[in-house]
Every structure is written in C-alpha cells, then in structure tokens.
C-alpha cells in the first residue's frame, strides 16, 4: 500500500517518474495497489480499450501468458499509469516524466500529452504489431552486463555463424543488449 506521507522533492530538480519497458512484468504486479481508486479507474480504462480485464491479467496470468507481448504491454502500461495517478492524487507531482521503450507511451499519458485512452489505444496497436513481427521473424534478445562495445561487436561476429547477431541497445555504460536469431543469441 502507498505510504500516505507526501514525499519531499529530491533536490532542486524535483521528483522524476520513470515508466519501465517490457521485460519488467511479473504475475501479481500491482496487487498491493488495486484497492486504490485511481488504480482501479486506470485499469478499468485500459480494460475498456483492450477489450479484456487487464487487472486480472496483471494479477493472475501465468508467466508464459503475461510474457506474450500482446499481454505484457497492456499490463505494464496500465500499471505504470495507475501508479503515477495514485501518487499524483496524493500530492506527489513529478517535475519530469520519463519512459523507457514501452514506458514512453505511459509517460505521455502521465504527462498529459495523451489521454489515457489514447495511450492505451497506441499500446494496443504497438503490442499487436510487435507480436505479428515476432511471429513472422522470430528473434531473441539478451542483455550483456559489464560489456564494452568493442568486445560485444567481436563476440557477435564470432557467434553469429551465418545468422544475425548484433548489438541492439546501448542501455548504459556496461550494459549492451544483443539481438538476432534465436540460435545466434543462444
């Protein structure tokens, strides 16, 4: 449950909300927040847009079902927006809102750049297109930790063995995500 004590701004820049991308989902996420009216309202809005009970999905889906991009994205987007709405209803206002990958859409909703319904509609199309692309062109990704670009590029060339294997995301110093065919990523 959210602590009802207001948070003090963190230094001169203030508080920043960050919405995560796909991959951070897990069954039961948000369970301790579902009694909050803002959370229920946000999940109800998402359910209306997606055409299924997004709260039930987030709370009760088996990991394999929740990890399907058509399910992970709606659940994560709804939860990210819901948490922000609950905090803001309690006087916690962000100085900035950021998002990583899928979280960029949640950040647009939280910042007021998109209505929640518009953001969820965008997530619906995004998740469907990504699922179609993945089915047509199976691929895999893996994050490499304590990695540098030169060694990752060399590793990709060495391990590709005729398949596709490339550095795809330079997340932060020391973390590089590689992507390619499932066999090459293995």
Question: Model-predicted segments: where are they?
Answer:
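Helix-rich "cap/lid" substructures immediately adjacent to catalytic or cofactor-binding pockets
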Residues: 2-98, 178
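Alpha/beta catalytic cores of group-transfer enzymes, especially the acyltransferase/condensing modules
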Residues: 22-24, 50, 111-186
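Short, electropositive, low-hydrophobicity segments enriched in small/polar residues
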Residues: 24-27, 32, 55, 103, ...
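Conserved short-loop catalytic and cofactor-binding motifs
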Residues: 30-31, 68-71, 107, 140-143, ...
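An amphipathic alpha-helix/helix-turn recognition signal
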Residues: 41, 75, 101-102, 114, ...
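Residues within well-formed alpha-helices
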Residues: 45, 79, 83, 105-106, ...
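A general structural motif at alpha-helix termini
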Residues: 61-62, 101, 123-126
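Gly/Ala-rich beta-loop-alpha elbow adjacent to hydrolase catalytic centers
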Residues: 80, 95, 99-103, 107, ...
